[in-house]
Amino acid sequence: MRRFRPLTWLAIGFVKGWRALISPLYGDVCKYQPSCSTYGLRALQVHGVFRATPMIIWRILRCNPWSHGGYDPVPGTPEARQWRELHPETARSKNEPIHDLTDDNPRDHEPALRKSIPGYTDPGSTHTGTPSHTRGEN
């Protein structure tokens, strides 16, 4: 049995009000599927207000002119699990290394490791710009 969660229901009411009153003024402008308001509503229903709020904020921040958009289900839902099973390449964590260095000789990866050091400039590189850590100050 689900318990009554007044903050969650208040947030759900806000999202439903937004969808009824504000969304029609803008039309279908969201780059993501489901729309940001549908995402927020689903996140609140599944996770509650405290866990859903950071998800909703992050989703709204990602919905900008520079994003590519696409299908973005709420984490922890059956839709998200099904999407991960059908598209395992999209389930990779941003912190997960693309290549596992543990099985290889580390000396094979030294140039790649050096390039990951902030301020490192490859001696053979033609890049003459200001290092990013100086923020334009010389």
Swiss-Prot record:
Membrane topology field: Peripheral membrane protein
Segments for region (Disordered): 71-138
Cysteine-cysteine disulfides: none
Residue ranges, compositional bias (Basic and acidic residues): 81-113
A cellular-component GO term for this protein: plasma membrane
Keywords, sorted A to Z: Cell membrane, Membrane
Subcellular location, principal: membrane
Listed Polar residues bias regions: 123-138
Source species, domain of life: Bacteria
Compartmental location: Cell membrane
Keyword Cell membrane: yes
Functional note: Could be involved in insertion of integral membrane proteins into the membrane.
PANTHER family for the chain: MEMBRANE PROTEIN INSERTION EFFICIENCY FACTOR-RELATED
Family assignment from sequence similarity: Belongs to the UPF0161 family.
Protein name: Putative membrane protein insertion efficiency factor
Species per Swiss-Prot/TrEMBL record: Cutibacterium acnes (strain DSM 16379 / KPA171202) (Propionibacterium acnes)
